[in-house]
């Protein structure tokens, strides 16, 4: 027999709000944490305070595993999917590394598997583990961002796709005009032509056109990085030459593109305009779904 949602929300809230608690999961930032926020909202608890108040924080092991594969893969077995690309499914990683994980997707089994994978990274790549853990909050991450110089950083994100290890060098072009937690980044491995040749309206259309519909047109090489969502960012030299080669990333091309951006500062104003005039947010009329209204 389970609890009703109000009781369940109170029990979870009591656990999550213990001071100096770090909530860790596997893809939790994009899924579990959104569920948590909405449950707390529906039951009259602050939907955000649990993740920052009283020195609390959150962290996501999925991007830790992606970063470990891309930047420091030694000591861990990396399984592949049917397409020959690295798989970061928790049940694949545990099997490849000899970790017991019966009943995958059973809540408790996944908790123990997540803890075991975290211990594995901590043991095999302790410096990377400690770096990522210490850079899980937006204040620490903000110290890496140098917008005026567009200083390149290495960024690991599922948005880049497994074919290049979810990794690229990026340059911070500008802060988002409305969201102070978001940085507009340029994917330096991409084609700079859309940024240089298109006006703001055409660039916005290119940005929001699905890749499958672009045909031979190059995608707009820009993405938002939300510093309050535990993104993986590090100094550019964290990406070793041998790992760049393994991932198919040309460091030389990335650095040349960074120079090209610095030589064309008008791109910054154009890209800010793209995000300043994005499609308006449509509020929900469902009272239980108005968290982000």
Q: What is each model feature region?
A:
Residues 56, 180-183, 228:
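Sequence-level motif detector for i,i+2 pairs with an aromatic at +2
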Residues 73-92, 154-180, 235-249:
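A broadly tuned preference for mixed-charge, low-complexity surface segments
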Residues 1, 16-127, 132-135:
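Metal-dependent phosphoesterase core characteristic of DEDDh/y 3'-5' exonuclease domains
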Residues 1-41, 45, 87, 91-97, ...:
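Conserved non-catalytic scaffold segment of RNase H-like nuclease domains
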Residues 134-214, 222:
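Acidic catalytic cores of enzymes that act on phosphate-bearing nucleotides/polynucleotides
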Residues 16, 69-72, 98, 136-140, ...:
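Generic secondary-structure transition motif, activating predominantly at the C-termini of alpha-helices
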